[in-house]
Amino acid sequence: MSNLSLLAARILLALLFIIAGLGKLADVSGFAGYMASGGVPAFLAWPVIALEVLGGLAVLVGFQTRIAALALGGFSVLAGLLFHFDPADQMQMTMLLKNLGLGGGFLLLAQAGAGAYAVDALTGRRAAA
């Protein structure tokens, strides 16, 4: 995989989480209520927002990329299963598949590493497995 491909993948994957996390800051209590409606304790709203924003930023700049990618990938799959698994609702199932696809993309990124255009490359972390 080329370094430009890895950079593009990091940017595209990260933007979703950075924007989504920052958007949740506009109504944290509403987001906490949404989480609670899915059976997830409302007090986890802040850690989820932090994971989305900080994990997204880490992936974007290529810092601790493998860890951040695994965290966001696992989060994507778990959130999809908790909030979007509804076989009676085609849109929710599409959202589930989107989350599963994100999980797959992050798994690939965790395996490939951040590439040369990343903080990890500057600090001597392996760019590829």
What are these regions (language model features)?
Residues G38-G39:
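Flexible, solvent-exposed coil segments and beta strand-coil junctions
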Residues M1-A26, G33, A42-A50, L54, ...:
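Extended, low-polarity transmembrane helix blocks
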